[in-house]
From Swiss-Prot:
Protein name: Neuraminidase
GO molecular function: exo-alpha-sialidase activity; metal ion binding
GO CC list: host cell plasma membrane; membrane; virion membrane
Species per Swiss-Prot/TrEMBL record: Influenza A virus (strain A/USA:Albany/12/1951 H1N1)
Virion surface side: 28-470
Length: 470
């Protein structure tokens, strides 16, 4: 083959390759156009149905590698219209308690990014229930978890996440800088109360829908503190209780009425022989009932009930089935403070039904272990130690902690009554488990049902120590 023939042959091959490449490019353009037309047609069809599509992305990090677990398209059909929560309904009749949520946050936190927390609580709007919690500005199994047994620090913050989920940086919403807190929804927006600052000058910051609306300064300069559970909203007004003063003697207790984040009224309780801390409150037929912790001298729980004008009544649960911890053995109760083992205490709750009362308490008399619900049909007014129903939810051998009430309004459930619910904190780590450098907790929750339920144990279940502890 002479040089001219070689040139012609090479040129022909190049032209053939170029032609094939051009055909492939044209085919690619046609394919993209067809695909786009199909997608556009699908979107137009969705628009005709007048539905909104929300894409939920579930992502995580595994050993520093980003993994997209799932992308799920969900048709959002729930009405998000705002409405004022009336709070006028009575509590639903119940026979027991059904498990509602369990977040397993300590177990998950041994390998995943989960916040170190304490004082979790639950509050519901007319659309959803959320878990609120006080972080320590640290993650489990990380060096900054060291020393998180401390209650009050500038690193603590109130955050929230969907109920039943382990609180992590990826699903949690910042609410307020706080080492003591409360939150509730009036049907129009979230009210959050976050207390932070020095012991002798703490400040409560009130926010409504995330905007600062009011400030409350410590009036006794002795650790201003609030409920560590949900506040209560009735007919557009929200109510909360704060304490300022000694934890082992008479202190100052104030009820605040708040509308859209602004304080409209407040009163101080005249209760020189009572002690109110960490109150668990709920609405009942337009009034507010709070069952609290007496850290001074009562092993039975104090209560305060008030209407929307803040006219109030006070007392102690009379039952000989004692609700605090530490406490004596059940026996003879009193409608005044029961002084036996009355010092110290733990946050708790009860639900009043006429003269009867559902009492939530640790199973242990002396340590924060186990949890049970007891129905005393005459316990609000009578002092005997008899009861009719006991339901176990955490075994005596497993750690518990704080507990508190929350309700689900008829606007959420569709019922014609207020559904009573409660949560239990499952504390792990220090000071009891000294193999760890940290203190944190997970949570479980239950709601009242008018049907048979079951005795069982839903413990935290994490195996300690973690890698950071070794």
């Amino acid at each position: 083959m002479n040089p001219n023939q070689k040139i012609i042959t090479i040129g022909s091959i190049c032209m053939a390759i170029g032609t094939i490449s051009l055909i492939l490019q044209i085919g690619n353009i046609i394919s993209i156009w067809v695909s786009h037309s199909i997608q556009t047609g699908s979107q137009n069809h969705t628009g005709i149905c007048n539905q909104r599509i929300i894409t939920y992305e579930n992502n995580t990090w595994v050993n520093q590698t980003y993994v997209n677990i799932s992308n799920t398209n969900v048709v959002a059909g729930k009405d998000t219209t705002s409405m004022i929560l009336a709070g006028n309904s009575s509590l639903c009749p119940i026979r027991g308690w059904a498990i509602y949520s369990k977040d397993n946050s300590i177990r998950i936190g041994s390998k995943g990014d989960v916040f170190v927390i304490r004082e979790p609580f639950i509050s519901c709007s007319h659309l959803e229930c959320r878990t609120f919690f006080l972080t320590q500005g640290a993650l489990l199994n990380d060096k900054h978890s060291n020393g998180t047994v401390k209650d009050r620090s500038p690193y603590r913050a109130l955050m929230s996440c969907p109920i039943g989920e382990a609180p992590s940086p990826y699903n949690s919403r910042f609410e307020s800088v706080a080492w003591s807190a409360s939150a509730c929804h009036d049907g129009m927006g979230w009210l959050t109360i976050g207390i932070s600052g020095p012991d002798d000058g703490a400040v409560a910051v009130l926010k409504y829908n995330g905007i600062i609306t009011e400030i409350i300064k410590s009036w006794r300069k002795q650790i201003l503190r609030t409920q560590e559970s949900e506040c209560v909203c009735v007919n557009g007004s929200c109510f909360t209780i704060m304490t300022d003063g000694p934890s082992d003697g008479p202190a100052s207790y104030r009820i605040f009425k708040i509308e859209k984040g602004k304080i409209t009224k407040s009163i101080e309780l005249d209760a020189p022989n009572s002690h109110y801390e960490e109150c668990s409150c709920y609405p009942d037929t337009g009034k507010v009932m709070c069952v609290c912790r007496d850290n001074w001298h009562g092993s039975n729980r104090p209560w305060v009930s008030f209407n929307q004008n803040l006219d109030y009544q006070i007392g102690y649960i009379c039952s000989g089935v004692f609700g605090d911890n530490p406490r004596p053995k059940d026996g003879k109760g009193s409608c005044d403070p029961v002084n036996v083992d009355g010092a110290d205490g733990v946050k708790g709750f009860s639900y009043r039904y006429g003269n009867g009362v559902w009492i939530g308490r640790t199973k242990s008399n002396s340590s924060r272990k186990g949890f049970e619900m007891i129905w005393d049909p005459n316990g609000w007014t009578d002092t005997d130690g008899n009861f009719l129903v006991k339901q176990d939810v955490v075994a005596m051998t497993d750690w518990s902690g704080y507990s508190g009430s929350f309700v689900q309004h008829p606007e959420l459930t569709g019922l014609d009554c207020m559904r009573p619910c409660f949560w239990v904190e499952l504390i792990r780590g220090r000071p009891r488990e000294k193999t760890t450098i940290w203190t944190s907790g997970s949570s479980i929750s239950f709601c009242g049902v008018n049907s048979d339920t079951v005795n069982w144990s839903w413990p935290d279940g994490a195996e300690l120590p973690f890698t950071i502890d070794k």
